[in-house]
A protein has these predicted regions:
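Noncatalytic alpha-helical scaffold of FAD-dependent oxidoreductases
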Residues: 2-449
Length: 449
């Protein structure tokens, strides 16, 4: 499935503006904007593609309701606006590397898979990546997107500084070192505070990674050795369709050290794969990153999918729920009982670990977490009936949904599960007192009474 291409900025000049919004003035097909999965059509009638901060400031002065748009990888309306979307696609550069501070500064719309090779050539790496390298930095961090690893925080945890433009046109810089609480509130900001223009990320010396895959892990082995299995590599993912009392695949990603050895033919009863695999076993692994223990650069092994390929198996929907790691086995057992309900609409589920962080609106705030991800067939009518059942099963564990994916959790329940929500609302009102960045998603899920 190819991504929808955004319309090009009109060359017509509008009085008081450096460029005009893209609005429905030509054929409908050219003006329809959807997310990458194609399940959501954006409703904002105006669309801008500024190339500089000055152009962004010009847009901010004339736009009313507005919202930043990144790489369109969210499955809901979090990035939509009743009036204007402002794309960060032209803010896509690696700006600088500070070798003393061990940080890299990139523009907000930079995609991990695009700047990672450049960073690697300089001898540096990020601590982790998500399963897709196609996502933009600001959007990923604003929604607490993550990879896996019991000691690895989500992508937001690498952020040490950010620059954002507020509704008033003020350029605000916040850093982990100097701004403490404001910073912890702003990093996972859900697009509520302003438009991020650049971010500074922690880096480390570059490293290589190998992937070893195992198939058909017996369910009882997982229950008996859950923590051992998920700690068996730097980053570990479990794939399951909730059928046949087994985990279909175990992906173990390990940093390559001088003493790194083969994991052998067996992992707690799962057998080593004999060829490269797609998470959905029946699909071709052509678009997946290299496996079979072949070492490679961190940015070509930590994601599941190659940058040059469309990762999707076709049109799909996604949901994900985070539970405290201490309750992971109980949560798994609760979901496993729902296998017959989940399976008919499921493509695949993935189970990952994420280390705790301190961001106010992060699902992993103050808790090491296990995330249960669902890739669904694109049948929202049926999936929307299953989600409340999943959420009910996970309710005893105070499960928190991924902000950029699909969920049906009652907003009042979200309010209970995010202790810092009142403080976050104060922060949002401080930077956006007139609510220019509010939209249906925020009104429903965040600005709840």
């Amino acid at each position: 499935m190819k991504r929808n291409e955004f319309l090009k900025t009109s060359s017509m000049l509008v009085a008081g503006s450096m460029f005009s919004p893209l609005i429905s003035c030509t054929s409908q097909a050219k003006n329809v904007r959807k997310n990458w999965a194609g399940n959501y059509q954006y409703q904002a009638p105006e669309y801008y593609e500024p190339k500089t901060v000055d152009e962004l400031l010009t847009v901010m002065k004339r736009a009313g309701k507005r919202k930043a748009l990144g790489s369109c990888h969210c499955f809901n309306d979090i990035a939509d606006s009743p009036l204007a979307q402002i794309s960060t696609k032209n803010f896509n550069k690696l700006l600088s590397i500070d070798e003393q501070a061990m940080t890299v500064t990139v523009e907000a719309g930079a995609r991990y898979g695009q700047f990672a090779p450049e960073l690697d050539k300089k001898g540096y790496a990020l601590h982790n990546l998500a399963s897709l390298p196609h996502i933009s930095v600001a959007g990923a961090c604003a929604t607490a997107t993550h990879g896996s690893g019991v000691k690895n925080g989500n992508l937001s945890s690498a952020v040490s500084g950010l620059e954002l433009v507020t509704a008033k046109g003020d350029v605000v810089n916040l850093t982990r070192a100097n701004d403490a609480q404001l910073f912890n509130g702003a990093v996972v900001g859900l697009g509520a505070l302003g438009i991020i223009t650049k971010m500074t990320l922690d880096i480390q010396k570059t490293y290589q990674v190998r992937q070893d895959l195992f198939q058909d892990l017996p369910l009882q082995s997982l229950l008996d050795h859950f923590e051992e299995i998920l700690a068996s590599g730097y980053s570990v993912s479990l794939f399951t369709d909730w059928q046949d009392k087994k985990i279909s695949q175990v992906w173990v990603k390990r940093k390559v050290e001088a003493d790194t050895k083969s994991m052998g033919p067996d992992l707690f009863g799962a057998k080593a794969a004999t060829k490269n695999l797609h998470p959905i076993t029946k699909l071709s692994a052509e678009n997946c990153t290299e496996q079979m223990g072949v070492p490679g650069p961190w940015y070509e092994r930590l994601p599941h999918f190659k940058m040059g390929f469309t990762p999707s198996s076709g049109e799909e929907l996604q949901s994900e729920y985070f539970v405290p790691k201490m309750h992971a086995v109980e949560a798994f057992q609760a979901l496993e009982k729902m296998g017959s309900i989940i399976y008919p609409q499921l493509m695949i589920s993935e189970i990952r670990t994420i280390a705790a962080d301190s961001f106010w609106m992060s699902p992993c705030r103050n808790q090491d977490s296990v995330a249960f991800h669902f890739t669904w067939k694109q049948n929202w009518e049926e999936v929307s009936k299953i989600l409340p059942q999943i959420e009910a099963e996970l309710a005893p564990f105070n499960a928190r949904p991924h902000w950029g994916k699909l969920f049906k959790v009652d907003p009042k329940v979200l309010k209970e599960r995010y202790e810092m929500l009142p403080e976050f609302l104060q922060l949002a009102r401080m930077y956006d007192p007139q609510g220019h960045f509010r939209n249906k998603f925020l009104d429903l899920n965040i600005y709840v009474r």
